[in-house]
Amino acid sequence: MPRMLPDGRRLGAHLPLGGGMVKAVDRAHEIGASALQIFADNPTAWRRRQGPPTEQAAFRARLHEHDIAPVAIHAPYLVNLAGPEDDLFGRSVAVLANDLRAAPGFLGRFVNVHVGSHRGSGVAAGTARLADGLRLVLAEVDDDPDAAMVVLEDSPGSGFGLGTSVTELADIAESAAARGVPSRRLGFCLDTAHAWAAGIDLSDPDAIDTCLADFDSRIGLDRLVMIHLNDSKSERGSHSDRHEHLGAGRIGAAGLGHLLRHSALAHVAYYLETPGMDEGYDAINVARAHDIAAGRPLDDLPAEAMEVRGSRARTGPGPDQDRLN
């Protein structure tokens, strides 16, 4: 039985598949994760793999063996359903639909995608375009018991990004519903670093309560199914998305702990996207999440931890699984 957060909540991390799919599951188990987020294919390319990767059956078996779930698949960074360009829109619909169709093979429950950018067309036009795209995507994917849910992730608010507030997310949900998108097929993800960058004070438990109450009244907290649990290097409201080790950034342990213990979020799956996955900080941040949830004091991080940046988590399955570049 994997280690759980309060009320049996599950904590995962975004881990790379480039070194092998089964090894990624073993790594998740080793670091104490009880859920997993992955890229199912190359996150920076439009071309998708033809057919399942060779390790997929063994990957599923290992997930069952270690009781790691739910699996979230992060869609490619290129996807943008909110922009006015027809070519980009069409490619985005095709790629997101492909990842949704592929998700059951990975035991994927969620396909997480950024809300996107209206690229100057305006918030209203971008919202309508996104809703049209979601309708087209879901029309291409069978609605069966194993189908994954599309999960829209909030934006830090840089440039023309949509989804920077509960109001904008609610408008997206309403626009999608008006086009016949069932609520059971469309969920939402709160990225704590994004919300902080957009100006939401997640360091303050009272402000968190206000935000969640607003989300519940406008959208419904049952549709908030994922939280990307990240601290932030950036100033609140800066629109700068720079993730930090848990409890070492500007959000801090008080706010993150409130999110981890909040009674209205017992159904949510939490996923870390913190720095230094390749340097062993994945295990450290999983442990810190449990300490924060329990209200325990955090150990000091070594000085070099603050210099760590990216990780191989930004890759899909390696060449032995036919990764396409």
Question: For each of these PLM feature ranges, what is it?
Answer:
Residues 124, 162-170, 196-267, 275:
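Gly/Pro-rich active-site loop or hairpin
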Residues 87-100, 123-136, 165-175, 206-209, ...:
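Short, electropositive alpha-helical surface patch
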Residues 28, 74, 92, 103, ...:
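Conserved, mostly hydrophobic/aromatic
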Residues 34-39, 69-73, 186-192, 221-233:
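Non-cysteine beta-strand/loop elements that form the S-adenosyl-L-methionine
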